[in-house]
A protein has these predicted regions:
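Terminal appendage regions of diverse proteins
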Residues: 30, 124-242
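Feature representing long, continuous alpha-helical segments
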Residues: 16, 21, 25, 59, ...
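Active/ligand-binding-proximal structured segments within catalytic/core domains
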Residues: 1-47
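Short, hydrophobic beta-strand segments
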Residues: 2-5, 42-52, 147, 218-230
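A generic structural motif
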Residues: 3-7, 17, 49-53, 136, ...
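Non-catalytic interaction/regulatory segments
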Residues: 30, 41-138
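Extended hydrophobic-aromatic, low-complexity segments
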Residues: 8-12, 31-35, 54-58, 77, ...
Length: 242
């Protein structure tokens, strides 16, 4: 087995346990696992919750997990524990797992206690760091979080830095000025669009005057026959409104 691959899977697996508990701390104990996927690329965790998590909640979950990582807590496994004893200890069961009469219990200090037979790190510090990438809906009442750990977080940050550098170069400003620059450009575009709309309205009014001057009166109805191919759709809409 590739050691690097196994190590990254272990990071993501232990991080899944930490995040599960962190979700319950932030959202309440009703936030229970509804499915999960762990591989070397990252982790995916489905859990019961009736609505989208807000930014502050996601940040708090991230903070809790990273604090536990920095504490470098020993990750202890208790083998061949009777299933009833494990439940009495308060161990949470992972979704979709079938348990024998004797089970393996994974403990991260007094923070996380779950039944699990997978590969894990020996101490939380081995995870390195933890980053939530996305949070969304799977189905009614079930949310999904995707996250990364270890070297994948470094790759993620590198990608963001490259994008920021490219944006600052294109906008000809420092990174700290990017948001202000974009806001200024949006305001400028909005102002120009308003000017264009005003000009189109004025042109349409002039065109309307010309059309009415060349109209034909049939009883009480003014009839205008004109080829308007040179007029844009937006100008034509303004003209019709007149």
């Amino acid at each position: 087995v590739n050691l690097s691959y196994r190590q990254q899977v272990a990071r993501n697996h232990t991080a899944t346990h930490l995040m599960h508990k962190a979700l319950q701390v932030v959202l309440g104990e009703s936030a229970k696992q509804a499915g999960s996927l762990v591989n070397a690329q990252g982790l995916r965790f489905d859990f019961s919750y009736p609505k989208a998590m807000i930014k502050e909640q996601l940040e708090k979950v991230e903070q809790i997990v990273n604090e536990k990582i920095l504490e470098n807590i020993p990750v202890v496994t208790h083998d061949k524990v009777e299933i009833e004893k494990a439940k009495n200890m308060g161990a949470m069961a992972m979704f979709g797992e079938k348990y024998d009469e004797h089970v393996r219990v994974l403990q991260v200090d007094n923070f996380s206690l779950e039944l699990c037979g997978g590969t894990h790190v020996q101490a939380s510090g081995e995870i390195g760091t933890f980053k939530i990438i996305s949070e969304g809906s799977v189905t009614s009442g079930v949310r999904r979080i995707e996250a990364i750990t270890g070297t994948k977080v470094l790759e993620y940050i590198k990608g963001i830095n490259e994008t920021m550098t490219q944006a600052s170069n294109e906008l000809k400003c420092s990174r700290n000025e990017i948001v202000a620059k974009i806001t200024a450009l949006k305001d400028k575009i909005k102002s120009q669009e308003q000017s264009v709309t005003a000009l189109q309205s004025k042109l349409a009014q002039n065109k309307l005057s010309d059309l009415l001057a060349n109209s034909t009166q049939v009883k009480d109805i003014q009839i205008v026959i004109e080829n308007l191919n040179e007029i844009s759709v937006s100008e034509l809409e303004i003209l019709c409104d007149k």
